[in-house]
């Protein structure tokens, strides 16, 4: 054994504990603090459910963060065991040690560590603790200090459980929600469930679940299928959204009260950085949405929105869309003679745009050729998608020759040239032999341009 290698000694100690579970369970209260983090990681990776359950009870730090740990479906039982054993009430035995763990964060985040560094032992702090909810540790302790000043009353010890939720109606989701509600009941009000990322499939079936969540915490909200009226009711309980994604939303009219209420809620979202409106009919009304958005918008997705020439003209002049990093305008027909508004938009975004998608937009040869000068000015572009547009091989080759000058551009999703189809874009009419020749030609062109780092791919439907 190398006595000069502390990491190796630590690993050996952890493996020794895991190989003798019964002894490890008895020794947890006595092992050094420095051993807890590697023991927790190894126990989770190895599926040691009983040890994880006990680790949560005696965790010697203020917070426990899943951080970079990868959670697969078989490990959901480990998560449930940790939640079940998360100490949310003071110990019944006065001789028992008060648990130190106050914040259990089950979200996956590769940028954070297993626990936050201890800046102050007297005033422990977690960088990821809830800041918006009235039920957060910070707000409750502030209130307790005010109410109990000069009083000897012992107040409940607030704790937080941070989760991302996907409400899809599955059995696993229902079991997880029952577990959370039982834990809230067990805590007698001291547990705050803090959900930051909320994804909902079929909003109409999730109203009861949404009632027990504090939606002030949510900063990422996604709905796949729902009425705008129901969505507006949910948005009224949110205040700090950074990302809003709505797919296949139904509403009666762009001039009705519901749409106006929706715009009113968007106006309040001062922190919004990402907006995704997919299959959201906006023809000739894009200006009404964009005008109420904050100027800090980074990501804008508008596929299947039936955008008009008027909408594109406004988009090119809109300050809210002048600093975008990502723009997705796929499945909006662009068959106009005048492409100047779109060229102007790309010019405005030349300093920031990293990801552009204009797939299925009916962009032909002349339009694509007119876009090349604007595209090559987007020097930060990393991903470009313009698949399923009626482009000929000469124009596709011209696009490739032009784009190879963009050193940051690594991924291009290109359209299959029209000569590869008996009838363009009809299912079953693709000549795969012709496509194979196109792919060989493009590969050779990349090699000549010394851009083997670029990945040109296409879809064969």
Language-model segments: residues:
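C-terminal capping region of solenoid repeat domains
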Residues: 2, 76, 85-89, 119-130, ...
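N-terminal alpha-helical scaffolding segments that mark the starts
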Residues: 1-40, 44
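Alpha-solenoid helical-repeat scaffolds
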Residues: 95-301
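Death-fold interaction domains
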Residues: 42, 47-141
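Structural position within Leucine-Rich Repeats
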Residues: 197, 220-225, 248, 274-279, ...
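A structural signal for leucine-rich repeat
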Residues: 119, 210-214, 232-240, 255-270, ...
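Short, solvent-exposed loop/turn at the beta-strand->alpha-helix junction
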Residues: 19-23, 33, 48, 111-114, ...
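Conserved hydrophobic position(s) of the canonical leucine-rich repeat
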Residues: 23, 101, 218, 241-244, ...
């Amino acid at each position: 054994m190398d006595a000069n290698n502390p990491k190796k000694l630590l690993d050996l100690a952890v493996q020794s504990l895991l190989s003798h579970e019964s002894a490890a369970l008895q020794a947890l209260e006595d092992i050094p603090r420095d051993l807890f983090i590697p023991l927790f990681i190894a126990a989770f990776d190895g599926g040691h459910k009983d040890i994880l359950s006990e680790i949560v009870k005696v965790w010697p730090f203020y917070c426990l963060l899943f951080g970079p740990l990868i959670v697969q479906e078989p490990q959901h039982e480990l998560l449930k065991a940790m939640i079940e054993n998360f100490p949310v009430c003071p110990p019944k035995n006065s001789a028992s040690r008060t648990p130190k763990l106050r914040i259990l964060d089950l979200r996956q985040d590769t940028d954070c560590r297993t626990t936050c560094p201890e800046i102050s032992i007297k005033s422990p702090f977690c960088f990821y603790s809830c800041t918006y909810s009235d039920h957060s540790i910070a707000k409750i302790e502030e209130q307790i200090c005010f109410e109990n000043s000069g009083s000897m009353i012992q107040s409940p010890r607030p704790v937080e459980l941070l989760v991302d939720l996907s409400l899809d109606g599955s059995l696993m989701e229902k079991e997880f929600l029952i577990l959370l509600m039982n834990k809230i009941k067990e805590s007698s009000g001291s547990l705050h469930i803090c959900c930051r990322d909320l994804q909902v499939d079929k909003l109409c079936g999730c109203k009861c679940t949404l009632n027990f969540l504090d939606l002030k915490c949510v900063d990422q909200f996604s709905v796949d299928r729902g009425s705008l009226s129901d969505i507006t009711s949910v948005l009224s309980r949110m205040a700090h959204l950074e990302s809003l994604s709505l797919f296949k939303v139904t509403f009666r009219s762009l001039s009705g009260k519901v749409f106006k209420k929706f715009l009113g809620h968007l106006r309040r979202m001062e922190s919004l950085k990402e907006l995704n409106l997919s299959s959201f009919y906006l023809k000739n009304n894009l200006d009404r949405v964009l005008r109420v958005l904050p100027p800090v918008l980074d990501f804008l997705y508008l596929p299947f929105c039936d955008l008009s020439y008027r909408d594109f003209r406004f988009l090119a002049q809109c300050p809210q869309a002048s600093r975008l990093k990502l723009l997705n305008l796929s499945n909006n027909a662009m068959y106009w003679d005048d492409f100047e508004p779109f060229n102007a938009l790309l010019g405005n975004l030349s300093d920031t745009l990293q990801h552009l998608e204009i797939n299925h937009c009916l962009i032909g040869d002349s339009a694509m050729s007119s876009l090349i000068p604007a595209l090559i000015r987007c020097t930060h572009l990393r991903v470009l998608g313009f698949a399923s547009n009626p482009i000929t091989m000469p124009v596709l080759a011209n696009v490739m020759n032009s784009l190879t000058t963009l050193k940051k551009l690594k991924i291009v999703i290109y359209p299959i040239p029209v000569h590869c189809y008996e009838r363009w874009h009809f299912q079953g009419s693709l000549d795969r032999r012709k496509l194979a020749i196109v792919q060989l030609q493009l590969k050779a062109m990349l090699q000549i341009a010394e851009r083997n780092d670029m990945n040109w791919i296409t879809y064969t439907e």
